[in-house]
Amino acid sequence: MKIRTRYAPSPTGFLHIGGARTALFNYLFAKHHNGDFILRIEDSDNSRNIKDGEKSQIENLLWLGIIPDEKPGSETKFGPYRQSEKLERYQKLAQELIKKGFAYYAFDNQEELKLQKKEQIAKGIFSFRYDQNWLKISDQEKQKRLKNKHFVIRFKVDKAKNFCWNDLVRGQICFEGSAISDWVIIKSDGFPTYNFAVVVDDFDMEISHIFRGEEHISNTPKQIGIYQAFNWKTPKFGHLTIITDKNGKKLSKRDKNLFQFIEDYKNQGYHSEAFFNFLALLGWTSPDSQEFFDHKSLIKAFDYKRLSKAPSHFDIEKLNWFSKSYISKMPVDKILENLELSDNQIWNRFFVETFQKSSIKYADFYKNFEFFHRPKQEMDEKMLEIFEKLDKKPVKIFASKIDYQNWDYTKINDLIKEIGQKLEITGKNLLLPIRLATTFTNSGPELARAIWLLGKKIIEKRLLKWK
């Protein structure tokens, strides 16, 4: 049997960190076993779908390096890959369940359902149990009500059964059928509910293994019931633990202190392979505690048995460390492909070489680029106050000896060393006066590099009064 996994988002939002990790683990598992990874779009809830939601999901998966073997638009025997294109299939199978006695029409209105819930709460039953009243009506009454077209189709849960599975992450899990209410499989608008459509889709696409978030544990017994009703083979399930923030709380889309969506990290210029690597370690560890993996080595190393049963912690500092490490090892040409800087390619290369080791993300290059592209017109008060207390001799010598005709980093660096030897000074005593006079700031990259990047016109203008 070929391993087939899937990631099945709804286009109701953009790709979230948790969703990306789910997609990644399904992808790694499939590729480790030479299987297929499928992207399916669960768009049956039109009221919640957002414009470009599907496009965002696909583009951000591709940015991470999670490449589906099949997706919307693929022409295979397993499609279509959007739920909205399969409505007839769901409705046909729902009718089949009715004929087999596994489902039935229910004609309750909202007020009647509220009354049922209220009566059960009064009896101390706080988890709603649908009372199956509509199973007792005559065929004549049923046909009469069907003409009004206000009904849903409910799955008839076998209350005598236990619904169990050996979870790939958590081990044996069981739910008593008596604790599960008869649930809606087809809504009044004719659209399937999630728990019904997802089973049909997974069966149609021959999905063998499903890794998903722990919030789906309570959905699993309902889905197993559908598999059993059709006598279909049930896939293997694995439920991943939650991802928490630095305070140990579950990641929330309402938390404004941490980017929640992959799009945000992409736009900030995080290294995509670094994020891929970092994401894999949110709930999975290698046998030898290795942390750095390229794409192929991660696929080779991935073993679902090493998925954690404990919550994983999203550590932004760890992500920054990964991204910085990846960027520091990149060929300069590759970095330049991701940046739009000046028209001077020699300057661009020197600029990237200057900031490569200190940059966490591509946005850091742009931040530093602004310093040179839009240089300050004068020293601010704070810097001026520092500068006034310093010995100006290094600045005067530098201003009188710098060679503007042969603008060269090595010559600038040698001149600074020469001044230090002449005045018998080092460190801040040598560098800080020159740095403030030339760059108008007391910090930055190696001084000679900063001076070269600012360019001879700006430096000559700033040092004019010190000649």
UniProtKB/Swiss-Prot annotation:
Task: Write out the function statement from the record.
Answer: Catalyzes the attachment of glutamate to tRNA(Glu) in a two-step reaction: glutamate is first activated by ATP to form Glu-AMP and then transferred to the acceptor end of tRNA(Glu).
Span of the annotated motif 'KMSKS' region: 250-254
Subunit-level organization = Monomer.
Q: What is this protein called?
A: Glutamate--tRNA ligase
The short motif 'HIGH' region is annotated over 9-19
Keyword list (alphabetical) reads:
Aminoacyl-tRNA synthetase, ATP-binding, Cytoplasm, Ligase, Nucleotide-binding, Protein biosynthesis
Q: Tell me which EC number(s) this protein carries.
A: 6.1.1.17
Q: Which GO terms describe its biological process?
A: glutamyl-tRNA aminoacylation
Coiled-coil segments on the chain, per record: none
Quote the cellular component terms of the Gene Ontology held in the record. Answer: cytosol
Q: Which Gene3D superfamilies match?
A: 1.10.10.350, HUPs
Q: Which gene encodes it?
A: gltX
Concerning its family, UniProt says: Belongs to the class-I aminoacyl-tRNA synthetase family. Glutamate--tRNA ligase type 1 subfamily.
